[in-house]
Amino acid sequence: MSNNMDKQSYIDEAEKELLHTYNRFSLVLDYGEGVHLYDTDGNAYLDFAAGIAVCALGYSNEHHKEALKAQVDKLLHTSNLYYNAPVIEAADKVLNASKMDRIFFTNSGTEAIEGAIKAAKKYAFTRDGHAGHEIIAMNHSFHGRSIGALSVTGNAHYQEPFEPLMPGVKFADFNDLESVKAQVTDKTCAIIMETIQGEGGIYPAKKEFIEGVRALCDEKDILLILDEIQCGMGRSGEMFAWQNYDVKPDIMTCAKALGCGVPVGAFLMTQRVADKSLAPGDHGTTYGGNPFVGAAVSAVFDEFKRLDIVSHVKEVAPYLEKKLDELVAKFDCLTARRGMGLMQGVECSLPVGKVSAEALNQGLIVITAGSNVLRFVPPLVIEKSDVDEMIEKLETTLVILSKSL
């Protein structure tokens, strides 16, 4: 296949060869710089999706690139039969930021969820055998598409074609403490939730809810698993979203911005859980935690520190919220804004898929969450001027669609 094909030729080739698991936009992206992406026709797009909350540092960050190039020249992979320095350095940085005690690196977010589930089940087995195996998850949640992660994803649309799934999962309503309490039995080993529900429509946990769940877990010796795959890594205005509350998880997961484009995830736990859960032979990975991803994670944390990303999010996020609120007040098709930090959602009565498509015509990348929410998860390095540009492009989009639909 030639590297000089036109856009339609690339698309035609993809439609013949790639498994049709995505309804893609008719766009072939070529390169990125800062907070902009460029397609093969040379068109520029202001990116307010960041590869679905992945590219926190934007595109072509020099420190990140140089760290990856240096590691490619040195050592890509060894296996976990041996130690390697880059992943040990990365582990230290993640643990220091999270105040957790132990970490296992995976290749993705869904693998991190699988590991977290296994750790919780092994902890319960060590404590009382197979008696305590049930997990409480949240309605409208999303944790991934592998079987274990899908089993704790509270959306029948994703689950039904793959049933029967993992047994022993119950669902409660997010931000409803009494609903969670009603599902607890002496068989409950863990409660899993996103600190901010993402795919479900951008719903941050209410303070009284998440702190109430933490207290419930303490009372019943239940493990609290917090999924920080999308909302973690500075996006909320703290390094991890749970740090906005008076809670600490027993197990947490992260991925996406952890490698800023390099495939890597992780699940972390307290020493108490580590002492009674996964031991040699219980879990493993071929690629997870190799030197290349270790260098990537380490470079990301170095850049977060150098650029003071968390403080920057705290500065820019209120401006984004203000401008989105003004937009909601201006357009009847927009009904509500909610979110935390640079993870925001706006309810829209127009077909949100069509809004995303028309936004591309205006040079803006914005994605959806749920059936009626526009999701804003830009690179964390955006400036207020980028927010202004986004609002201008989105206004144009909404005006066009309001007239045509």
Annotate each language-model stretch with its function.
Residues S2-L405:
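Conserved N-terminal phosphate-binding loop of PLP-dependent enzymes in the Aspartate aminotransferase
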